[in-house]
């Protein structure tokens, strides 16, 4: 299994700089992304669901601030959005995908 991680410092800007091509060339099973700095409902499907991946995102409440995501080739058994602590979950900093034998967090 290949896992990659990247701080995109703004998903829209990263897409403009070739992020989707980078993603396609990684041949990773899971890609963790940090600092998406966007609300996922505002993103195009090409960003949410790039070819071969399902995208999962946890947005920050504050516009243009933090946020994390996971691009997964295989659909996880479960996704955990946040840690369950409202005082920190509003920043959109923890997203976990659970599989049969492991979990991965972004």
Residue ranges and their predicted role:
Residues 1-50, 65, 81:
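N-terminal, active-site-proximal structural segment of metallo-dependent hydrolase catalytic domains
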Residues 37, 45-106:
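Structured beta-strand-rich core segments of catalytic domains in phosphoester-bond hydrolases
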């Amino acid at each position: 299994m290949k896992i990659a991680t990247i701080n995109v410092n703004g998903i829209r800007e990263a897409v403009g700089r070739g992020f989707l091509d980078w993603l396609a060339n990684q041949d990773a099973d899971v890609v963790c992304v940090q600092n998406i700095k966007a609300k996922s409902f505002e993103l195009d499907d090409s960003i949410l669901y790039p070819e071969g991946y399902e995208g999962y995102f946890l947005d920050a409440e504050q516009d243009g601030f933090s946020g994390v995501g996971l691009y997964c080739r295989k659909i996880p058994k479960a996704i955990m959005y946040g840690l369950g602590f409202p005082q920190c979950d509003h920043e959109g900093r923890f997203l976990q995908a659970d599989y049969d034998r492991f979990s991965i967090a972004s």
